[in-house]
Amino acid sequence: MEITASLVKELRERTGAGMMECKKALTEANGDIDAAAEAMRKSGAAKADKKADRVAAEGRLGLAQDGGKAVLVEVNSETDFVANDDNFKSFVNAVAAAALASGATDVEAVKAAKLADGRTVEEARATAVQTLGENIQIRRMVNVDTTGNIGAYVHTNGKVGVLVDLIGGDVELARGLAMHVAALKPPHNKAADVPADFVEKEKEIELAKMSEKDKAKPADILEKIISGKINKIVSDVTLYGQTYVLGDTTVEQVVKAAGADVAGFKLLIVGEGIEKVVEDYAAEVAKAMQV
């Protein structure tokens, strides 16, 4: 039977395997797509290793919390299709629960943690690779262990998650702050957390942008102008300096009014820092058929 491009594409969509793997399986199965798919499932363990070098930039965040302890884990997949699969969602939630229960503080510890069924997270991940047909990776985890209030929030699409450590105040305020961080994504907590080299660089930029007339002003006046601009920039990049999304005053004012203090926060964004590969499936099929 002729192995057509459409047949290869259909098998790829069913299995998530590479074009060349699909073409080879179809050739060995004499064009029987069901037999080819079954053969590829049987060789799933080998495929799991091959998938490890494929870019996994999609995925979801898993959240688990128990009192003053909470954990966020990032589990990556190759496509949004798999990220929205119920089996993948269940796996992510199970990973988060295992991470919390085990007291894991890094990814390697998460991988070694035991799930409710007795398997390690790593063993379950390898099975998920076979079942879902994509490179699945446990990429990052963050946790908070506090005597204060935890604001835990994961956006409905599972792509952005936040843990806020609030000393004082209440859980409602802590969650509101977590939602704020998820929405505006401030790089820093307070002005004191902003790196000095960032501030100096911004001063240089603001000075360079000034007109010659302004630069000619007395040094004390010039310093006040630049300081005002820098204060605005620092406010924009800090949680405390931003206007609270659920109010009309700054976060600092809201927190202080509650007699509280934000000890810190953790923000995860799925796929952040990963270079995504834009695939041309038509070209990939054509290339596979030429071999």
From Swiss-Prot:
InterPro entries per UniProt: EF-Ts_dimer_sf, Transl_elong_EFTs/EF1B, Transl_elong_EFTs/EF1B_dimer, Transl_elong_Ts_CS, UBA-like_sf
UniProt keyword annotation of Transport present: no
Matches recorded under Pfam families: EF_TS (PF00889)
Keywords, comma-separated and alphabetical: Cytoplasm, Elongation factor, Protein biosynthesis
Any one GO molecular function term: translation elongation factor activity
Gene3D superfamilies registered for this protein in UniProt: 1.10.286.20, DNA helicase RuvA subunit, C-terminal domain (1.10.8.10), Elongation factor Ts, dimerisation domain (3.30.479.20)
Region Involved in Mg(2+) ion dislocation from EF-Tu: start-end pairs: 79-82
Cellular component GO terms, alphabetical: cytoplasm
PROSITE patterns in alphabetical order: EF_TS_1, EF_TS_2
Compartments, as annotated in UniProt: Cytoplasm
HAMAP family named among the record's database cross-references: EF_Ts
Record-stated family: Belongs to the EF-Ts family.
PANTHER family reported in the protein's UniProt record: ELONGATION FACTOR TS, ELONGATION FACTOR TS, MITOCHONDRIAL
Function of the protein: Associates with the EF-Tu.GDP complex and induces the exchange of GDP to GTP. It remains bound to the aminoacyl-tRNA.EF-Tu.GTP complex up to the GTP hydrolysis stage on the ribosome.
Protein name: Elongation factor Ts
Native species: Stenotrophomonas maltophilia (strain K279a)
